[in-house]
Amino acid sequence: MVKIGSHVSMNGKKMLLGSSEDAVQYGANTFMIYTGAPQNTRRKPIEELNIEAGTEHMKANGIQDIVVHAPYIINIGNSIKPATFELGVNFLKNEIDRTEALGAKQIVLHPGAHVGEGAEKGIPKIIEGLNEVLDPNSNVQIALETMAGKGSEIGRTFEELAQIIEGVTHNDRLSICMDTCHIHDAGYNIVEDFDGVLEQFDKIIGIDRLKVVHVNDSKNERGAHKDRHENIGFGYIGFEALHNIVHHPQLSDLPKILETPFVGTDKKNKKPPYKHEIEMLKEGNFDPHLKEKIMEA
């Protein structure tokens, strides 16, 4: 059975229990959460995350291999502002503690941005930060995400990610999250030659490091370096290629996580597409009228 889910929120009093309930409603058997708002550092204490009730609900409903995503504000690639780097290191340590408490094994991290100083300065800074953060005795791995190459993002090529991994002391605590929109926007031809892309990944990084897949279509043509997610089948990657990736035999054990946009033009009335997209990807049938159906439901 394919391991597929989506990003779900974790908030209110229910916290982890609410996340699991949403995932089950979507027909998922895994999910990804932020431990709080991705744009800030405000977090509830671990004892208020409702972990016990959430874990029981997950077990009862066959949910496993959940994933945590670190917030966007962490940038350990910043070599200009020491305060930004230190904030990133300290907050990431706390996020790993929360990830472990939640029972997740993977925390996805955008590697960082060099803020105009060039990858030759950003990459050593990321290595320095990861060396401060990683605990060889932890059960959690940091899954470095493949990036689209927007702005000064680092991680736009497999080579950049490999360079980071090679520089880190306890790099057995590092894994990779492959985002389909990001690698498409970075220039990799996943539409016509996903097997070739995987082969390249295996040679440069090693397929064993791949632990999470973000399944997103793209609003942009290959190589655009934009990072704008589109709903499954409505973008430049297309349904067939994404269905192939979700069901690829080399990725069968990995959680596939949808981060596609909510549907609707009215900002106050947008609806999650995940139940419908998960169903489409499981069954292999693309519905070109999906967006209208979601809004009519």
UniProtKB/Swiss-Prot annotation:
Keyword field contains Metal-binding: yes
CDD domains given in the database record: AP2Ec
Binding, Zn(2+) 1: 69, 110, 145
Keywords: DNA damage, DNA repair, Endonuclease, Hydrolase, Metal-binding, Nuclease, Zinc
Residues bound to Zn(2+) 3: 182, 227, 229
Entries under NCBIfam families matching the protein: nfo, PRK01060.1-1
Protein name: Probable endonuclease 4
Organism from which the protein derives: Oceanobacillus iheyensis (strain DSM 14371 / CIP 107618 / JCM 11309 / KCTC 3954 / HTE831)
Primary gene name: nfo
